[in-house]
Amino acid sequence: MDYIDWDKYIYMSSTSVYNPKHMNTVEADFNGYSNDFVWCNRFEFPYEEIKRQAEYALWQKYSDKKWIAVRYPFAIGKDDYTKRLLFYVEHVMKSEPMYIDNIDYQMSYIRSDEAGEFIAYLVDKDIEGAINGSSTGTISLREIINYVEENTGKHAILSDDGEVAPYNGEPEYSINTEKAEKKGYHFSNLKEWIY
């Protein structure tokens, strides 16, 4: 980035920069000046720290440039190669035990295609710095599991000895998108598409 020039740089960050996420998480909850950045590659630190380091670089080294750091929660959709949400559905369908440590926590998500649409929307908008993107509303894993059970007749097997679920360790949180809404973007309602 030291050798190129740009009108606006849009970086796809993550809500994992927030430590911790909580209900009504706002952009100011992560300060890009709170720590010194370290030049590193993506394998030197855990995912959330890599995202923080990338933002530290934008805030501290490139503060004289126009940039946006778009912070998303888990992006899910047909192209979700992580298959984290599918883990829960498949374990219910196959009656395989799973260990979930946050089954009743409300969490935020965004549709993967909407994540792309929002980045495209920002291209010609007068905005700089961090901005959150997330579907409106939250849902718990229990609500998702209950839906699968009700529509398939299958039952979840929850066990401390079950396979560790991919969203374990996530806190209860929601992502505030008022900044994006003030710029004219309105996110979809999570419960209108998640099922």
Residue ranges and their predicted role:
Residues 89-99, 104-138:
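Alpha-helical substrate-binding/gating segment
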Residues 118-172:
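Mid/C-terminal beta-alpha module of Rossmann-like enzyme folds, strongest
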Residues 13, 54-79:
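Conserved beta-loop-beta element that borders a ligand/cofactor-binding pocket
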Residues 48, 69, 109, 138, ...:
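Short aromatic/basic micro-patch
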Residues 1, 20-23, 79-81, 142-143:
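Short glycine-/acidic-enriched loop or helix-start segments at secondary-structure transitions
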Residues 112, 146, 164-187, 192:
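Conserved C-terminal active-site "lid" loop/helix of NAD(P)H-dependent oxidoreductases
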Residues 58, 92, 179-181:
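Structural element of the ATP-grasp superfamily
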Residues 2-52, 67-68:
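Conserved Rossmann-fold NAD(P)-dependent oxidoreductase catalytic core, especially the SDR/UDP-sugar
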